[in-house]
Design a protein with these regions (language model features):
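Bacterial Sec-dependent N-terminal signal peptides
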Residues: 1-27, 283
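Local sequence-structure signature of Cys/Sec-based thiol-disulfide redox active-site neighborhoods
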Residues: 24-65, 69
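Short, conserved sequence motifs used for protein processing/export or organelle targeting and
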Residues: 55, 62-271
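Short, solvent-exposed loop/linker segments at the N-terminal edge
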Residues: 140-145, 278-286, 300, 369-372, ...
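Asparagine-centered strand-capping/turn motif at beta-strand->loop junctions
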Residues: 155-157, 292-297
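Short acidic/proline- and small/hydrophobic-mixed sequence motifs that coincide with surface turns
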Residues: 160-163, 298-303, 386
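Terminal connector regions
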Residues: 240-254, 339-370
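Intrinsically disordered, low-complexity Pro/Gly/Ser/Thr-rich segments with frequent PxxP/GP/PP motifs
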Residues: 313-341
């Protein structure tokens, strides 16, 4: 982590144009809420906690920020392959006595609370004045996977503590994985949101040594995002940043959050196929392939010509239209295509020319279905008028191969 820190104390009567704040308000504001929820993939009541937290955030847009900390026994991945734990979770839980799940804190101003208390505690905090305002923005270089986080803070009143700490949390959304759920049934397709993956400023944050009214904090961090955390892949398009100040290691007067922007694309217009949905073994019937495309360009993607064929046979074309922002993806079901079946079959998909054609193609293999020969015994149970019953057995071409009656 690299950082650049600038602190400027301003006289109360100084013109606002003298200092360089750009993303933080200098007017007194009420507290923003940071809800840190302690959770786990085998915690059956945790989905209810997630829903409660999401409702609080949705009811207070721009004023409530969620951090889901996977920690404790319920976060043990077992054989699932989804280890959402971090090096920071145990210490965060220990300082607030989070030994039941789900539990959480509102601005770290109490011991861990049960989910039934979160809404009331959040409303109380939102009604209190804050002595500091926080603003944050972030950008990710898509070539290097480096995130740059810019945080500003402005003290509108003296902090009760001579030293404060600035914290920057990196979160990941939309991670599909397992979750025990007592209300809706266990699933392997749960959408995990606001998942803490890293604390860019370390366990307890960076020290702020001047905390009097008029103090302006301007800090920039850079952090190289890895390909995965504990084997769980990182998707940079799903990342989120929450910045907050604590008076010690507890008691947050305020915080803020943002979704990163993205820069340094290799091309302005670049669509690429990222995956083809697995195709089950086939008997030679027409298939309807599903392909996922991603906008890996700087400009919005609104149209793509898709050409596809199987086993080198006749190609078909399909034109997709829509709207994808940079790094967004969409799965497209292509119209059915016929082919000459082989033992191993290959579908090839190519996107239309754009600014970078090096990533415009993808292929996927699928097998012929196994054939078996065996004896089939058919028992036909009739009523008292059995002579009126007839039967037919037909093949895949709707031809009658056996009949009776």
């Amino acid at each position: 982590m690299k950082k650049k820190l600038f602190i400027l104390t301003i006289l109360v009567l100084t013109s606002l144009g003298i200092h360089s704040q750009t993303i933080v308000s200098t007017s007194p504001e009420n507290k923003k809420v940071v809800l840190e929820e302690f959770t786990g993939i085998t915690c059956g009541y945790c989905p209810d906690g997630h829903a409660i937290a999401n409702n609080i955030a949705n009811n207070n847009p721009g004023n409530v920020f969620l951090i889901n900390i996977h920690q404790g026994g319920y976060a043990n991945p077992g054989n699932s392959g989804f280890d959402f734990r971090t090096p920071f979770g145990n210490a965060l839980a220990a300082q607030v006595g989070a030994n039941f799940y789900p539990s959480g804190t509102i601005n770290r101003n109490s011991n861990a609370l049960g989910r039934g208390s979160w809404n009331g505690a959040a409303n109380t905090a939102l009604g209190q004045s804050s002595d500091v305002n926080v603003g944050v923005e972030a950008d990710i270089d898509v070539q290097t996977n480096t995130i740059t986080v810019h945080v500003e803070a402005f003290y509108t009143a003296d902090s009760p503590e001579s030293n404060n700490k600035l914290n920057v949390a990196l979160l990941q959304n939309n991670t599909i994985g397992p979750q025990t759920d007592y209300a809706n049934g266990n699933t392997t397709e749960y959408n995990h949101m606001h998942r803490l993956v890293w604390l860019i400023t370390g366990q307890w944050g960076e020290i702020i040594t001047t905390t009097t009214a008029g103090t302006f904090i301007d800090e920039t961090y850079t952090y190289d995002i890895p390909n995965d955390y504990n084997g769980v892949p990182v998707k940079i398009q799903d990342l989120e940043v929450v910045a907050f100040i604590t008076e010690t290691q507890l008691d947050m007067p305020s915080g803020s959050g943002t979704f990163p922007t993205y820069s340094n694309f290799s091309a302005e217009n670049n669509a690429r196929p990222t995956s083809v949905e697995a195709i089950l073994p086939q008997c030679g019937f027409d298939i309807t392939p599903n392909v996922t495309i991603q906008n890996f360009g700087e400009n919005d993607l609104t149209e793509v010509e898709i050409t596809y064929s199987v086993n080198g046979g006749a190609s078909q074309n399909y034109t997709w239209t829509g709207s994808l922002l940079s790094l967004q993806s969409e799965t497209i079901q292509l119209p059915a295509i016929s082919y000459e079946v082989e033992d191993v079959n290959t579908i090839e998909i190519t996107l239309s020319d754009d600014d970078d054609n090096s990533d415009n193609q993808i292929s996927e293999n699928f097998n012929i279905a196994n054939e078996h020969t065996t004896t089939v015994n058919m028992i036909l149970n009739t009523d008292n008028a059995g002579s009126q019953c007839t039967w037919d057995i037909m093949n895949s071409n709707d031809e009658i191969i056996y009949s009776g009656g």
